[in-house]
């Protein structure tokens, strides 16, 4: 069986943590920022963990 290829789009968006979880950045931070509050934009800068429901599918993209 040939080697599995990593999904390059997923590789750029997700990073594995030491404990095996997947880290991702939040959306809604690229444009139309004037109407968003400073607090909201500040919270969007923080990374978060991929939800349990999406974890299984994303894990298949990153062998």
Swiss-Prot record:
SUPFAM superfamilies: L35p-like. The keyword Kinase does not apply. Keywords: Ribonucleoprotein, Ribosomal protein. Belongs to the bacterial ribosomal protein bL35 family. HAMAP family: Ribosomal_bL35. PANTHER family: 54S RIBOSOMAL PROTEIN BL35M (PTHR33343), LARGE RIBOSOMAL SUBUNIT PROTEIN BL35M (PTHR33343:SF1). One of its GO terms (biological process) is translation. It comes from the Bacteria. This is Large ribosomal subunit protein bL35. It comes from Alkaliphilus metalliredigens (strain QYMF). One of its GO terms (molecular function) is structural constituent of ribosome. Pfam families: Ribosomal_L35p (PF01632). GO terms for cellular component: cytosolic large ribosomal subunit. The keyword Chaperone does not apply.
